[in-house]
Amino acid sequence: PGNNGTAVLVPVPPLSEERRQELNKFVHQLVEDGRIAVRNVRRDGIHNLQNMQKDGHVSEDLIKDNELEIQKITDSNIEKLNTLQDDKEKEILEV
C-alpha cells in the first residue's frame, strides 16, 4: 500500500481467467434469481386477479386485459435483466 498524503493507494492485481468465470457464474445466478422473483410476482398478481373474479368484484374482460398488462411488464423486466446480464458479462470478460 502506498500513501500520497491524502489517500491510501492499494494495488489490485488483474482478475485471472478462472476468477472471471466464477464472477460470470455469480452474475448468471443473480440474474436467474431476479427472473424467478419477477415470475413469482406475475404469478401472484394473476392469482389475485383470478380471486377477484371468483368473488365477483371484476369482470372477465378486465381480468384478461390486466393479465396481458402484467405479462407485458414481466417481459419488459426480464428483458432488462437479460440486458444487464449481457452487459455485465462483457465487462467481466474484458481483459
Residue ranges and their predicted role:
Residues 8-95:
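Positively charged, low-complexity, intrinsically disordered RNA-binding extensions
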Residues 1-3:
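Short beta-strand
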